Amino acid sequence: MIVRAWRGRAAPAQPDDYPEHFRFRVLPALKEIKGFLGASLLRHDRPDEIEFLVLTRWTSLDAIRAFAGEHLDRAVVEPEAMEALVSFDPTVRHYEVIEEAAIRRRK
């Protein structure tokens, strides 16, 4: 499994714009791509900005290529996302998952 990581930053006055874009535009599009396994949107509040970290999970680099095109390390940032953010990383990082664990709670 491959994790694709990207960061964007929003103004504190607009804390919900990017999460709404992610939830209603990005996720539905990603779910249509073969090889997409899931995504997480993480938020870190700072005094002067809100940092979002997007982690998407994929079966392979070929699956990512179906989303990102041939330039795998270039961020895919739609105009709506650009409007919701004050800055963002122009590139992404890919990580190979070498171990994963989850806690299963008893009911």
Where on the chain are the PLM-derived regions?
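Short, well-ordered beta-strand segments in beta-rich or mixed alpha/beta enzyme
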Residues: I2-R9, S40-H71
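Short, surface-exposed ligand-recognition loops at beta-strand->loop->(often short) alpha-helix junctions
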Residues: R9-P19
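Residue-level signal for secondary-structure boundary sites
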Residues: Q14-D16, D62-I64, E100
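Intrinsically disordered, low-complexity segments enriched in polar/charged residues with Gly/Pro
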Residues: Q14-D16, L27-P28, L42-D45
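An amphipathic, aromatic/His-enriched active-site/gating alpha helix that lines ligand/cofactor pockets
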Residues: H21-I33, R57-R93
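Short acidic amphipathic segments
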Residues: I33-A39
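Glycine-rich beta-strand-turn "strand-cap" elements at beta-sheet edges
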Residues: S40-I50, V76-K107
